[in-house]
Structure formats: structure tokens, C-alpha cells
Curated annotation (Swiss-Prot):
This is Vesicle-fusing ATPase. The lineage of its organism: Eukaryota, Metazoa, Chordata, Craniata, Vertebrata. It comes from Rattus norvegicus (Rat). The keyword Magnesium applies. It catalyses: ATP + H2O = ADP + phosphate + H(+). Its main location: cytoplasm. The gene is Nsf. Detected in brain (at protein level). Belongs to the AAA ATPase family. Phosphorylation at Ser-569 interferes with homohexamerization. Mg(2+) binds at T550. It is found in: Cytoplasm. ATP binds at N505, G506, I507, I508, K509, W510, P545, H546, S547, G548, K549, T550, A551, L552. The modification Phosphoserine is found at S207, S569.
Amino acid sequence: MAGRTMQAARCPTDELSLSNCAVVNEKDYQSGQHVMVRTSPNHKYIFTLRTHPSVVPGCIAFSLPQRKWAGLSIGQDIEVALYSFDKAKQCIGTMTIEIDFLQKKNIDSNPYDTDKMAAEFIQQFNHQAFSVGQQLVFSFNDKLFGLLVKDIEAMDPSILKGEPASGKRQKIEVGLVVGNSQVAFEKAENSSLNLIGKAKTKENRQSIINPDWNFEKMGIGGLDKEFSDIFRRAFASRVFPPEIVEQMGCKHVKGILLYGPPGCGKTLLARQIGKMLNAREPKVVNGPEILNKYVGESEANIRKLFADAEEEQRRLGANSGLHIIIFDEIDAICKQRGSMAGSTGVHDTVVNQLLSKIDGVEQLNNILVIGMTNRPDLIDEALLRPGRLEVKMEIGLPDEKGRLQILHIHTARMRGHQLLSADVDIKELAVETKNFSGAELEGLVRAAQSTAMNRHIKASTKVEVDMEKAESLQVTRGDFLASLENDIKPAFGTNQEDYASYIMNGIIKWGDPVTRVLDDGELLVQQTKNSDRTPLVSVLLEGPPHSGKTALAAKIAEESNFPFIKICSPDKMIGFSETAKCQAMKKIFDDAYKSQLSCVVVDDIERLLDYVPIGPRFSNLVLQALLVLLKKAPPQGRKLLIIGTTSRKDVLQEMEMLNAFSTTIHVPNIATGEQLLEALELLGNFKDKERTTIAQQVKGKKVWIGIKKLLMLIEMSLQMDPEYRVRKFLALMREEGASPLDFD
């Protein structure tokens, strides 16, 4: 049939507007026919027709979406001709349709089942024409949706013939919906529509990982394992499409707690996680900033942090972007409830507010809270359960491989500009910097740089840089070693000054007993290093006063070369209350647990316990704390050697403390004249003739004196005139009861 000119009109009823049909008078065309509307030589549009008596003959009525799609205006003259579909080539097999709410005021977050939508669509629009780019209105569950046809594939001709599918798919521009056509819905960009079911396309999701991200250039040394564990626990589920996560019934991890010693990279790791994720800028909050002097403001500050995430989840549902909130020093606001003094209870209500926001009645699935602290023991346990800060990751001191990575990172720019001398061996520095944190390694590099710069500053009346030499500036191995020796000491390392004072006179090996103690100590050191079955080794050096127990303990600790050595001594706890003593001892042991290999010397145990024989009196609180610490095994992968000293083995036996030690080693006094003469010869304070005189008096006799007391007597006698020294020494020995002899 030849075409005719008709006039475009407005659709007469709302019901017909939802039919996706052009409306004519029955005098012009019949219902169910298809027409091609030509608005210009190159613009043709296919419509299915319906009839209605209110439409004037010679007019063809269109809904607003149809007029918008075809570019029609009311009263426009258009050319209309009948159109016939080739059923073998133009039946729709699969049609992809973009969907969104028609009116923004009707937006909700309810899930819409695409399977039911597809069935309703086929029922409403069966045997209708559809074109790529066509716009229409679709009513479902009393809601109006705007649809846009994105893609049409023709049905396989084999299926139409009743044969098995051949697998051939052909794209077409115009097609006819039939009973077994498939419809796939695709959510419009930035739409908050929540689609569920199988009749939806896989969304083109923006990758959660920044496409420009390079894991090798992240600038975090020594945290490879920790970072991969965090990625596995917290981000693996977020990389998958929402539909797969939904089918698995999987919930995303909402919180990570990073804890560990200061300067080990907690804040750096959190910052890099924020950069890695293709999300909005993380909100970084220092814990104390949350607190406010006005009533209710602290809780309001918590609510403000989560407001954006709540609003977006209400709008976009499962397709909401990720919101990252980083709490630095989270222990400042999340202490155990009920632990804070005062009547206001502000801290408790802040904790309650945070708990309810992370995982409360209205659950948010689009947040990631990263908390950082070096005091995880202070944090309320309700915050650490699964569903809140469930991924707990210790960021500990870096091992040798980690230190090598960190030093490479901090010296990379110097190497790139040839400012690092060829004699600098980064591997050597990594070995020498045991128990250095990442911040301390960075400080070491800065100190070496300042040492190198200082060489090129002229020491004159004015501070000037020698520019001639400055151009040849290089940081050398000597600069690093000088900084290591003088400037930077690890907080969790070995401070030689701690134990140097205990062995300032060296170790006097006056006989086999001393050698045996040192040999046994060396065996225990090797056991601690090499045995996987005994990560905790403890030994008690017991013996009479002044026998050199502390010096021997310090020597064993020094010879161990452990990266962490600490001496727990009563002279550092003078005036401490019982509670303060317990806390000081606990801190020493807690610090030891952070190192791979540690040695703690618990000196003069009876003094730590405040023991006095009159009464007798001792501190039971300190005793119980010490018993627990002596028996507590270090964390997995860490090893600890404890060396205790006491002059009152009998007292510790009564207190049942001896059983807390793995073994006990006796440190005797000098007991024979021969041992005394050996000690005098090693000390070298007396001349040969003087030693001969002393030998005549003590050889073959029993003596009883500690090496420490012997040193004191020798030094006193050396203050006399040379001819009286021996007589004075022997007299002092007699007065001290060190020998039964009556010296002349």
C-alpha cells in the first residue's frame, strides 16, 4: 500500500500512552498493523498501531516518549506507510533494555525482580515493533519506568523451524516481540534502581582497584604479607560483581584494625589502601578530634562521618560506591566501656554510636573503617567482633628482607641522582639495623644525609656551603655507620648502656664454675635460637651475694647478640607502687614479644618482690605478675630467653617460683686458695712478689668470697703504700670472714 500524509497528534489517554503504540482512527488503519513513519528522507520509525474513536481521521497520535524519540511535534505532517516484518529474520531473540525510574520523586531502594519484569514486558508488548534507540514507558508493580532499547538480536531461524539452535546470532535494528523473546534489563547509568534476578545484564562496573595502581611502586617495604592478607580478607569480595556476591549471600568486610609498635607503617599502609581503591577520597580522622566539649556533639561527629555513605546507600543500594573512613589512634575514642572515670559517660556513648553505625540495625554495606592503634588491649571488645573491625592485622617490626625493602625505598632518589656512594651496601645496613622500625630506618637515612651535608659546610664566622665541594656531595658508608652508632637507636632494640655498667670490669674466669655457667648460658641461647619446640627458655642464676650473678647474666645476654635485650632491674623501679611495678614489668615483656628474638634479664628478684626476712614481708601482687610473665609463651614466630638472678633461692622455693624457670644454674663464690690466686693473676693488680706472699698464706686453704667483694677489697688495699698492700689485703679478707686464717 502506498504511503499517505498524516498529522501528528497527542495521545488521547494515559492508558494508551503506556501501550507503546501509535493511535489512529479505525477508518485509517486497523489495530495490530505496523506502520513506518518517515519524518525526513533519512529518518524512518516503525510503530505498531491501535485504534481509538477520539482520534480525528487523518491524524496519528503519539505519546511523549515516542514524540521525543522520533523528533515529532504536534501538528507536524508526516508520511505514513504500512510495514511488514520478515518473520524469518526480524523476530526478536534477545533484547537489551536500559531501565530507570520515570520520575525522580518516585525513587525507592526496593529490589525489583527482573524475571517478573521480563514476563510482564512480553505480556504487555507481545507482537509489537521495537527499534534500537526507542524510548517507551513501562508500568510494573504500580511504578512507572522509562525504558530505552539498547540492543536487539534476531531469533535463530532454526528455532523458528522447530530445529535445535544453530548458535548464529545477528544484530538487527528493528524487530518484532514474540512469545519466546528474551528481555534483559540494564540499569541506567547513575540510577539508584535496585535490580535482582537473572533477567539483567552484567553491569559495566567501575573497578574498585585504581587502574593506574602499581603494587610494586606502592612504597611500603616489609609489609607484603600483611598487605596481601588484608586484600584477601577485605577487598576480594568487593572486586567481584554485585550479582555474584548476592548469589553467594556474601557480606563485605566492614572494618580493619591495624595495630603494632609506633613507626612500623600503620598510617602509611592505610594511606596506600585509600590510594589503591578507585573510591572517593578517604575520610581521615584523628581519634581525639571526634571529642567535643558540648553535650552530644561527639556522637554527632561520628554520625557525620557516616552520613554520606548512608545517603548513597539509600539512593543506590548495592551499587553504592565504597566509602573509606580511617581512624588514627582509635583507642582514644573506643576504650572499654565503663573503664573511664567521670559521670558524663561521653566515651561510652561515642563507642555505642560507632558500634551502631558500623553494624547496627540499619546495616551499611558500602563502608570500610580502618582503625589504627598501638594499644589494641584498650579497645572495647564489641568493636572487634566479626561484622565490625573483624580483620585484625599486626604491623610488626620488619624482618631483614623488609628492612632491605624499606632502605631501598628511602635511598631510591639518592641512587637515581648518583648521590649514594658505591661503598654503601644496603644489605649490610639491613643486617645491622635489627629491630629498627620503618620510621627509624627513615630517620637513619636522614641522619646519614645530614652527616654528609655537614662535611660541606664551612666553619667560619658565617654559615656557608662550600659550593665547589657540594656538587660532589655523596652519602657514604661511613655516614650510615656513624649515624647508626651515634644518632639513631631502635626503641625495641638493644641499648648497650643498659647492661654495659654491669660488666664494666669484664668477666673474671677464676675457675671451672664460671666457665661452666657461661657454657650453659651459651647452650640456652642456642636452644632459644634453634628450637621450635621451646620458644620460651628461662634460667635462674642463683648463688650467694656478690658472686657476680648479674654480670654473668648480662654477659650471656650480650654474647647472644639478640636484637632485643632489656634488663628488668629494681633500681629502675624505686618508689613504684605495686601496680606501677607490675605495669613496668609487663611493658618490658610486651616490648620483647614484638621482636623475633628477645632476651629479658630479671635482676635481683627478691628486691623486685619487696622481700624482707623480718615478718617476713613480700608483694604478692608483684609475685603473681612475675609468675605469669615467666610462664607466658611469646606469640607464634617469636622467641624469648629469660635470665633471672637471686641470692635467696630458699625464699623463691617457698614462694613456688623455682618451678617457673626452665632450669637453675648455681653461681658459687671463690672457695679455695688456688681459685683466689687465679683471680688475682687475671686481675693483675698485685705484682708477682706480692702474689707469692699471698699464696704462702692461702694455698691449700679454704676461702669464701664473692668476686664482686674481692674486687672491692683489692681496690681498697691498693690505696695503701706498696709495702703495706698485701698485709692490708689479708687483713680485709679476715675481717670479711673470707678466710679462717689469722694473718700477721
